[in-house]
A protein has these predicted regions:
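Loop-to-transmembrane helix boundary motifs in multi-pass membrane proteins
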Residues: 131-132, 169-173, 285, 328-330, ...
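Extracellular loop-to-transmembrane helix junctions
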Residues: 56, 83-108, 122-126, 133, ...
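Extracellular/periplasmic helix-exit of transmembrane alpha-helices
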Residues: 103-116, 260-264, 268, 288-316
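Membrane-interface "cap" regions at the ends of multi-pass membrane proteins
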Residues: 2-76, 132, 203, 239, ...
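Transmembrane alpha-helical segments of multi-pass small-molecule transport proteins
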Residues: 136-142, 163-185, 203-208, 363-379, ...
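Juxtamembrane transmembrane-helix boundary signature
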Residues: 68, 95-128, 137-143, 182
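Flexible loop linkers connecting adjacent transmembrane helices
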Residues: 40, 80-85, 108-133, 185-193, ...
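Hydrophobic alpha-helical segments and their helix-loop junctions in multi-pass secondary transporters
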Residues: 179, 183, 202-228, 237-258, ...
C-alpha cells in the first residue's frame, strides 16, 4: 500500500510540475484561440481580464475546484457518512469511491464550460430561456440554495452548541455573521484571498475528520474488502442511494463554471488549452482531498461506532466519538464540523448570487443573498424540536434540483456550436450520459422512498 501511494504521489507531482512549466512558458493569446476554435468571447464575469499576470504559475492552477469541493464535505455529507459507517461498517466504501469518481468528471465539465465559453452555466441558461422560463428556473434554484444553506447553518449551529454550549438559534446567527464577513473577500482583487481562506478551511475540515483515525487506525484489510460492490438488504441499498444521490450538489455545478473566470479577476488569463490542463489538476487534487475526508468519516464510524445506537444525528455521532475516542478527538471533530459549516455556507451564498446574476441579470448585494437563505434556517432552529430532521428534508429538496443542473451541463459541453473544437467527443459524451442517468435515477429513487416513508 505504501509503495503504491508513493508512486501515485510522484506521478501527480510530475504532472503538476509539467503543467506549471507549460503555464510559465506559454504566451496567452486568448481572443485569437477562441476565434480559431469557433467559440464566442462572451461577456461573463471574466471576460475583461487584461491585468498583470499572476505572480506564480501555481496561482493559475489551484483554487476554483477547492472552493467548489467544500460542497462535498458539508454537514449533510458528515451525517450521511457517519450514519453509513455506524450502521454498515465498511460495506459501502465502494459507493464513496464511485461517487467521488463521478464528481471529478462533473466538476471538470463545469469548469471546462466556463473556461471555453467565458460564461457561467446560469448565464448560458439565461440566454436560452424566455423571461418566464428564466424566472421559474431561478425560483427552483433559489429553493435549492435555501435547502443547501439549511443543512449548512444547522450543522454549524450544532458544532457551536457542542463546543461552547450556545443555543442553536444563537449559533445560527453566529454562523450567518461570520460567513457574511468571509464573503467580503469574494470577487475582484481579493478573489484569491477568498480562495485561500476556503482552502485553509478545507484543511481544517480534513484534520478534524481524519484525526480520529490516528487514535484508532482502521483495519486495511476491511477497507479493501469494502471496495467490493455488495449490499446487505434493502436498507443498505437505500443508504447507498442516499450517498450517491447526495454526491453532486447543484450549486457546486453552477458555481464552478463561474469560479474559473473569477479566479483571473486579478491577472491575465492563460490560453484555453493551458487553463483546461490546469483545471484537470485543480479538480483532481481538490476532489481527492474531499473524497479522502468523506472516506475518513465513513471509516472512522465503521471502525469506532459500528453498532452503536444514537449515531443517526450529528450531535449523537459526536458524543459517541467522544465516548469511544476521548474528548480531544470529539472536540477536534466538532471543530472540523464548524469549519465545514462556515466554508460551505459561504460558498453556497456565493453560488446563489451568481445564479441570480446569470439568470435574472441582477447584481444583488452579497449580504442580501445571505439574508434570503439564512432566515429559513434560523426559523427552523427557533421552532424545530429536532433540527436534524431538517437535514433529511433538505436532502430531498436538493435531489429534486440536481437534474436541472447536470442535464444542461451535459448538453452544452457536447454542443459544437457553443464549444467549438473543445466540444466533447462521442465516447466522452456517452460516458457523461451514463453518469448523469445514474445520478438522476438514484436521486429520483431517494425522493420516492422518502415520500413513501422508507428513507
Amino acid at each position: 500500500m505504501a509503495v503504491t501511494h508513493t508512486a501515485a504521489d510522484v506521478t501527480a507531482a510530475t504532472t503538476m510540475t509539467n503543467a506549471v512549466a507549460d503555464i510559465e512558458q506559454e504566451t496567452p493569446e486568448i481572443e485569437k484561440e477562441r476565434q480559431l476554435a469557433g467559440v464566442g468571447t462572451g461577456t461573463g464575469a471574466g471576460a475583461n481580464n487584461k491585468k498583470k499576470p499572476h505572480d506564480h504559475a501555481l496561482a493559475s492552477i489551484l483554487g476554483p475546484a477547492f472552493v467548489a469541493a467544500v460542497a462535498y464535505v458539508d454537514p449533510g455529507n458528515v451525517a450521511a457518512n457517519i450514519t453509513s459507517g455506524a450502521r454498515y461498517g465498511y460495506l459501502l466504501v465502494w459507493v464513496l469511491v464511485l461517487a467521488n469518481a463521478m464528481s471529478v468528471l462533473i466538476q471538470y465539465q463545469s469548469a471546462k464550460l466556463g473556461i471555453v465559453t467565458n460564461k457561467s452555466l446560469p448565464e448560458l441558461l439565461g440566454e436560452r430561456m424566455s423571461d418566464a422560463g428564466r424566472f421559474m428556473f431561478f425560483m427552483q434554484a433559489e429553493v435549492i440554495a435555501i435547502a443547501t444553506d439549511l443543512a449548512e447553518v444547522i450543522g454549524g449551529a450544532i458544532a457551536l452548541n457542542l463546543l461552547f454550549g450556545l443555543p442553536l438559534f444563537i449559533g445560527g446567527l453566529v454562523i450567518g455573521t461570520i460567513s457574511t464577513v468571509m464573503l467580503w473577500f469574494q470577487g475582484g482583487k481579493t478573489q484569491t484571498t477568498f480562495e485561500r481562506i476556503i482552502i485553509v478551511m478545507l484543511l481544517v475540515i480534513t484534520f478534524g475528520f481524519i484525526a480520529g483515525l490516528f487514535v484508532a487506525p482502521p483495519n486495511p484489510g476491511e477497507v479493501v474488502k469494502g471496495m467490493i460492490p455488495c449490499f446487505q438488504g434493502a436498507d443498505s441499498v437505500l443508504m447507498a442511494a442516499s450517498i450517491l444521490g447526495a454526491t453532486v450538489m447543484p450549486h457546486a455545478i453552477y458555481l464552478h463554471s463561474t469560479l474559473v473566470n473569477d479566479h483571473y479577476a486579478g491577472g491575465e488569463k492563460p490560453s484555453i488549452k493551458t487553463q483546461l490542463k490546469g483545471s484537470k489538476i485543480d479538480v483532481a487534487w481538490a476532489l481527492l482531498l474531499a473524497g479522502t475526508v468523506n472516506l475518513a468519516m465513513l471509516v472512522l464510524a465503521a471502525n469506532s461506532l459500528h453498532g452503536m445506537s444514537g449515531t443517526d444525528s450529528i450531535d449523537g455521532a459526536q458524543r459517541a466519538i467522544t465516548q469511544v475516542l476521548g474528548p480531544v478527538i470529539g472536540t477536534i471533530f466538532s471543530i472540523g464540523l464548524l469549519a465545514s459549516s462556515l466554508s460551505s455556507t459561504s460558498v453556497g451564498t456565493y453560488a446563489g448570487s451568481e445564479i441570480m446574476h446569470g439568470l435574472l441579470h441582477v447584481n444583488a448585494p452579497m449580504w442580501a443573498c445571505r439574508v434570503v437563505t439564512l432566515v429559513p434556517a434560523l426559523i427552523v432552529l427557533w421552532f424545530a424540536k429536532d433540527p436534524t430532521q431538517a437535514l433529511v428534508i433538505g436532502q430531498v429538496v436538493l435531489s429534486i434540483g440536481i437534474p436541472f443542473a447536470v442535464i444542461p451541463l451535459m448538453r452544452y459541453t457536447h454542443d459544437k456550436e457553443l464549444m467549438g473544437k473543445w466540444a466533447d467527443g462521442t465516447a466522452k459524451h456517452v460516458i457523461f450520459m451514463i453518469v448523469v442517468a445514474l445520478i438522476v435515477a438514484l436521486n429520483v429513487l431517494l425522493i420516492v422512498l422518502t415520500l413513501m416513508g422508507r428513507a
